[in-house]
């Protein structure tokens, strides 16, 4: 098991690999207290830096590095779709603290990724992965609905980005 902060024997597997995929990061499905916030940011930034160092030290580095990121980085808006050309968030006047924090995490995560010196990098800005597995976000949302706590959130016009677990898996299967 990798701690996400140190290089170990796993770095040997990078040497000569075609692709490296880093999906490391503490779950955001938790209370946003100080300890969890610190773990959310550290687990993403530190693991990204360590993977970048391992790639930089490889005698035969991979051609591509796929790095997890998040759609949370985009501004909350109704007027346009968010894609790689979209407006980044964090400057919205009415954004709650938890939104700002999530955007700050995303920016720090991507900055650590951009600082890496590797050939080709791809930031996988993905959203919640919905699966029937116990303990996932779908399980959490269904638990709320079963208790009568589901329904429209806010004004009901906002979008919730998500990806089906099988589609998420297939993007790596080749």
Summary of predicted features, one role per range:
Residues 27, 70-74, 127-130:
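Active-site segment of SDR-like NAD(P)-dependent oxidoreductases
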Residues 117-123, 127-161, 165:
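NAD(P)-dependent short-chain dehydrogenase/reductase
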């Amino acid at each position: 098991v990798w701690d996400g902060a140190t290089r170990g024997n796993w770095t040997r597997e990078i040497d000569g690999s075609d692709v490296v995929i880093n999906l490391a990061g503490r779950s955001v499905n938790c209370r946003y207290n100080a300890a969890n916030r610190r773990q959310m940011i550290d687990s993403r930034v530190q693991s990204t830096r360590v993977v970048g160092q391992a790639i930089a030290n490889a005698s035969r580095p991979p051609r591509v590095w796929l790095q997890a990121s998040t759609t949370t980085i985009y501004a909350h808006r109704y007027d346009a779709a968010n894609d790689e050309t979209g407006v980044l968030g964090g400057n919205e006047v009415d954004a709650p603290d938890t939104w700002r924090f999530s955007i700050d995490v995303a920016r720090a995560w991507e900055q650590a990724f951009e600082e890496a010196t590797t050939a080709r990098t791809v930031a996988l800005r993905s959203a919640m992965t919905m699966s029937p597995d116990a303990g996932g976000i779908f399980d959490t949302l269904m638990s709320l609905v079963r208790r009568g706590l589901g329904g429209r959130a806010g004004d009901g016009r906002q979008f919730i980005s998500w990806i089906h677990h099988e589609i998420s898996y297939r993007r790596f299967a080749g």
